[in-house]
Amino acid sequence: MSKIINGEEFNSLVLGSNEVCLVDFYADWCGPCRMLGPVMDEVSKEHTVYKLNVDDEEEIARQFGVMSIPCVIAFKDGKEINRSVGLVSKSDILKLIEE
């Protein structure tokens, strides 16, 4: 299951981590975001996945240039390594961390 995080948790769990993780930038009102949810939950069985609500954490979304959602960003060592925008498949999500 994907863990919903806030701004403080983002700084410690994502930016402060040496591990690869995925962050799903979403909003509750976004239909494609809701459709991506089960895909991200499936990915979370094998990889670290966090969800960040862009309505609650506008500054972080702006900091990472999130203009459209859903937006999934892969991080490693606290830095962005890849991203995907829009409703995509599990295999497309996995490619973000395999490249």
Predicted regions and their residues:
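Non-catalytic, surface beta->alpha helical segment in thiol-disulfide oxidoreductase systems
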Residues: 76-99
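Short pre-active-site segment immediately N-terminal to redox-active cysteine/selenocysteine motifs
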Residues: 19, 25-29, 68
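Short glycine/proline-enriched coil/turn segments at helix->beta-strand junctions
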Residues: 18-19, 44-48, 98-99
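The canonical Cys-X-X-Cys-His
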Residues: 30-33, 72
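Structural alpha/beta surface segment adjacent to cysteine/selenocysteine redox centers
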Residues: 60-69, 73-75, 79-81
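Short loop/turn elements that flank and shape the SAM/SAH-binding pocket of Class I
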Residues: 11-13, 57-59, 91
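Thiol-based oxidoreductase modules, predominantly thioredoxin-like and allied folds used
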Residues: 4-6, 25, 37-60, 66
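A short beta-strand-turn-helix
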Residues: 3-20
